[in-house]
Amino acid sequence: MILAILILYILSVVGIGIYCRKKTSTVNDFVLGGRSVGPWFTAFAYGTSYFSAVIFVGYAGKFGWNFGLASTWIGIGNAILGSLLPWLILGRRTRVMSKHLESATMPEFFGRRFNSKAMKIISAIIVFVFLIPYTASVYNGLSRLFGMAFNIDYSFCVVGMAVITAVYVIVGGYKATALNDFVQGIIMLVGIVAVIAATLASKGGFSEAVNQLSHISTEGTASPELNGGFVSFFGPDPINLLGVIILTSLGTWGLPQMVHKFYTIKD
């Protein structure tokens, strides 16, 4: 049953790429989706680019364990500072200016905005160099999660995901990416709800889960003497918590894969 679902998912992803190929006839269509991507697809594309492997591996595993219930502040910060404000402040401005300058990428935007070929080249090098470890971390997290869930070899997961992604992106361009992000975003939302429900059910409900969490020792944290630190308002390590909120919320304002979503919106 699990194998059948997995195969169906892979076929669906590739099928979306083939379907979108018919609507991709120019470079503008391939890179920007013809600047015609609607609000729902754009929102899910932004969200799945923002919260990829980190939502299940980083937030749930690392931050959840380090900060307890206070890690909820990270989600709130990401939603307001990392998602809402960029759209309000950068969204329209970036869309209008990138259209006016006829730029399809961030390096191209900088080059034409400041009439500087050097800035275009330098920004392209920066994007290329620093997106390599970023992309590697995403594939690493997803492959480990996938491997544990389906008992598949890690190396096979990495190669398989890279090949599948390459196929639908190369074949269908950005429209295929946006449509796949929409589908995968729905799957992620369902998965998050299912994980939370299963966790609370296994602990006897929300109140009992919080009660059990309050008895976990904070030894090894910044406040080892704080009783019930994992259920406190700011957690056992508020300074590092604030740092994580700022880093994960404001850092997205300049990520090329996030800003690129503004280039593609229809209106």
Language-model features, listed with the residues they occupy:
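Membrane-interface "cap" regions at the ends of multi-pass membrane proteins
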Residues: 1-58, 169-172, 194
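Transmembrane helix-loop boundary segments of multi-pass membrane transporters
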Residues: 2, 61-77, 139-155, 175-184
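Hydrophobic alpha-helical segments and their helix-loop junctions in multi-pass secondary transporters
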Residues: 16, 20-23, 131, 135-139, ...
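Hydrophobic, small-residue-rich membrane helices and short re-entrant helix-turn-helix hairpins
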Residues: 27, 102-114, 173-183, 254-267
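Membrane-interface helix-loop-helix modules in multi-pass membrane proteins
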Residues: 31-102, 235-251, 258-260, 264-267
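Alpha-helical transmembrane segments and their helix-start/interface "positive-inside/aromatic belt" motifs
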Residues: 31-35, 178-191
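Small-residue-rich segments of transmembrane alpha-helices in multi-pass membrane proteins
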Residues: 39-46, 111-116, 184-198
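Helix-loop-helix module between adjacent transmembrane segments
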Residues: 74-169, 243-251, 260
